[in-house]
Amino acid sequence: MTHFNKGPSYGLSAEVKNKIASKYDQQAEEDLRNWIEEVTGMGIGTNFQLGLKDGIILCELINKLQPGSVKKVNESSLNWPQLENIGNFIKAIQAYGMKPHDIFEANDLFENGNMTQVQTTLVALAGLAKTKGFHTTIDIGVKYAEKQTRRFDEGKLKAGQSVIGLQMGTNKCASQAGMTAYGTRRHLYDPKMQTDKPFDQTTISLQMGTNKGASQAGMSAPGTRRDIYDQKLTLQPVDNSTISLQMGTNKVASQKGMSVYGLGRQVYDPKYCAAPTEPVIHNGSQGTGTNGSEISDSDYQAEYPDEYHGEYPDEYPREYQYGDDQGIDY
């Protein structure tokens, strides 16, 4: 008789095998043993894996659940007929309705490779049998929920298209009640001040936000002159139009001494050029004008000598006596 000899596992293979074996449930094995023996009427024995290895009990089990599932059951002691029985059982439970991911492989049972998966398959098979109405005294497996198929006519289907379910979200019964129109004035009040309640819905509580009593008081109109003062000099501002130096300063700049736009100004170096004979314009340091743009007498150097201030001789008489017969010949 041919046997499949498998050596011991080492390293990672041994670690994986031990991890799979640790998930094996001894209580589930005992429940499965009782359930299979009750359904088939055949004894498994003390060793669960050896009792199911030949596949005879498994084929008898599926034939009890679904008669005629396995046509021929091999009772030979050879390995290949036993593997054939296991293969026929796997095909039969697939046709019975088992999911592919719940079914073990033939080597998991025959070579004792993964008895945890074999146990999972048999528990799922017991639950499927319970779902289909096959009941026993052994309560094992989970009964699957039955499919509830409902049919609706066209009228109900069209009516349901206009209904918004709560699965799409809810607005918690929100409405526009109390909302004011655009541009409507709304007052502010603070509930903590124990003031009267708002008269209408146009009043906003400070819990909704506040502008801290901001207003346009003291704000000057565009173009209004605003003075500058220094707080360090303990000078009191005249009015709200005064700007503190903390806001910046232009260092008391003014237009004093600035010439009129378009007025010619000559540039010369006294080291290399003679004194100018035309008026010299300073940048506001001199001058007698009210706005600093006029030229003083000291800024002007005449190019002519001093005028004569003496008396002129009276060489000619100032008055001439002319007679009636006298005249002037030209």
UniProtKB/Swiss-Prot annotation:
Transmembrane segments: none annotated. The keyword Acetylation applies. The modification N6-acetyllysine is found at residue 23. The keyword Oxidoreductase does not apply. Residues 279-330 are annotated as: Disordered. Gene3D superfamilies: Calponin-like domain (1.10.418.10). GO terms for biological process: actin filament organization; actomyosin structure organization; epithelial cell differentiation. One of its GO terms (cellular component) is dendritic spine. Calponin-like repeats lie at residues 164-189, 204-229, 243-268. Residues 26-130 form the Calponin-homology (CH) domain. The modification N6-methyllysine is found at residue 158. Keywords: Acetylation, Actin-binding, Calmodulin-binding, Methylation, Repeat. One of its GO terms (molecular function) is calmodulin binding. CDD domains: CH_CNN3. Residues 306-318 have a biased composition (Basic and acidic residues). Disulfide bonds: none annotated. Belongs to the calponin family. Thin filament-associated protein that is implicated in the regulation and modulation of smooth muscle contraction. It is capable of binding to actin, calmodulin and tropomyosin. The interaction of calponin with actin inhibits the actomyosin Mg-ATPase activity. This is Calponin-3. The gene is Cnn3.
